[in-house]
Amino acid sequence: MIRTIKDLYAHRRLLREFVVRDLKARYVGSSMGFFWSVIFPLLNLAVYFFVFRLIMEVRFGDKMSPEASAMWMLAGITVWTAFAETVSRSTNCLVENSNLIQKVVFPSEVLPAYLTISSLINMMIGVPLVLLGVGFFIWRGEAGFVEVQTASLGAIDGQILDPGPDRTLRWGVSMLLLPFLMLAQGGFTLGIGYFLSALNLFLRDTYHLVGVLVTFWMFGTPIFYPVQMVEQARGGQFAFILKVNPMHWLIESYREVLLFGSWPQLHLIGPFVGVALLTFALGSSFFRSQKDRFPDLL
């Protein structure tokens, strides 16, 4: 893990060039350019809000307005989109850049890394949408967030946790926690990216399988519905999903910071940081152990 970090730092200029190139290439030829970073989450929100809130009538509490629930969904969609995009693109990044790996001495660990950083930057472009929505509800005096906070951030065993004044921060101060959450998210995502990109060279079907697994993972994460639906489904048979789902821990931590201006709950962010470190260590180690075989496998 340490060697990978040192290598990335040693090639930081190349890494930066790849990130800049990727950000520019995302919307090349588009008249709206980077505005798609804002529009795309809104379009996704419109689809999922229509399906889950209006058609399926998923409720987040009697006092939760449709507008407030839309902001709650948007916070989750923004984080998940960055994660899913990175995992999907990283899986096939070595194959797509085989010409670089085969012909020159190229630091291949840069490839999953620049995709991770690019997606995080793209995610941060969409974060102001959430903050603007929160500012609107504060200005309007919307109280619906209070109920969804105590409802969706309850303990995994089903007991509701009162956020309490001791955990409440001003929104401006809570924004200082975003870099920490992004760093943890980046480590977790990059670890997965390193593992899957190397595995895909041995099993080329990995890339296709990942798309299905990511979709299943998305619907198994409380992004479009409250936690209680998982805890109460079939008498609580699926409550274990919350206990083993790191993305649930991460998304709820982001919601605490973005929507409520609060500290992330320790029983959520603590395990996520541990899993992120372990995932990055294992993923980068597997990647490095197979690195010398990449040219032959390609």
Model-derived features with residue positions:
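Hydrophobic transmembrane alpha-helices and immediately adjacent juxtamembrane helices
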Residues: 1-298
